Amino acid sequence: MQSPPSESSSTVAPLIPSLAETIRGAWIGLPELKPLDADSDFSSIEGQLEGDDLLIRNELLCCRGVRKIHLELARLGRGLQILHCVWFPDPRFDLPIFGADIVAGPAGVSAAIVDLSPVSGTLPSGIETALAGTPSPAFRQVRDLPGWGTIFSPHVCFIRPDGAEEEVLFRSRVEEVLTILRTAVLQTACEPATAASTIRRYEGQLSYCLQQKRNDKTRRVLEKAFDASWADRYIEELLFDDPLPPG
């Protein structure tokens, strides 16, 4: 795995490295955990955007029940910083999609989101109960979801943290969500590839990926820093690649 972009502590939003460590800690001990191969030009990426260096580092793993764990850390010059993480489940397992994103700039963190998103209409009952029993803190600046945000669960947390205290609360929320997901990964049984429930989850994950690809901001940044063809490959093959058909 590649190391994340390095910066002095004075220029990196503290929430990004701390949340990255929280995420890495959550995948330790998952069943059959192993690195996931990726194209060599996707693991460590350098480009230029309007005179600033764009650095992207990707860490990819998989385990029993999760077809891909992806942690992306990106930095544009000394301004924009991004953390992006998705855990895509194997459709044979009744598991949601974990997603977390942080966007930060010189003024601090402007957006932070975490969710366990359903892939078959509703969350698995055990996860729904666990999330309902540990509600998100009452953050002061809750943000509106984008138009394609129907893919998220009712428990999605999308905020602009108001100061260091709320950044700590958000990290704690991500840790709670990951603990719930870890428990489910360890306990959920594999269903047959031909089961109707597996097919529904496969189709739901296809829909999730399609909706995420509608985020034109990501595509525009990548196209400017590299080119349209490369941006398409990065989005289609790495960020939101479709699951293989079950069976």
From Swiss-Prot:
GO biological process, one term: phytochromobilin biosynthetic process
Name of one Pfam family that matches: Fe_bilin_red
Keyword set includes Membrane: no
Enzyme Commission numbers on file: 1.3.7.5
Record GO terms (molecular function): cobalt ion binding; phycocyanobilin:ferredoxin oxidoreductase activity
Domain of life of the source: Bacteria
Reaction it catalyzes: (2R,3Z)-phycocyanobilin + 4 oxidized [2Fe-2S]-[ferredoxin] = biliverdin IXalpha + 4 reduced [2Fe-2S]-[ferredoxin] + 4 H(+)
Keywords: Oxidoreductase
Role summary: Catalyzes the four-electron reduction of biliverdin IX-alpha (2-electron reduction at both the A and D rings); the reaction proceeds via an isolatable 2-electron intermediate, 181,182-dihydrobiliverdin.
Recorded family membership: Belongs to the HY2 family.
Protein name, UniProt field: Phycocyanobilin:ferredoxin oxidoreductase
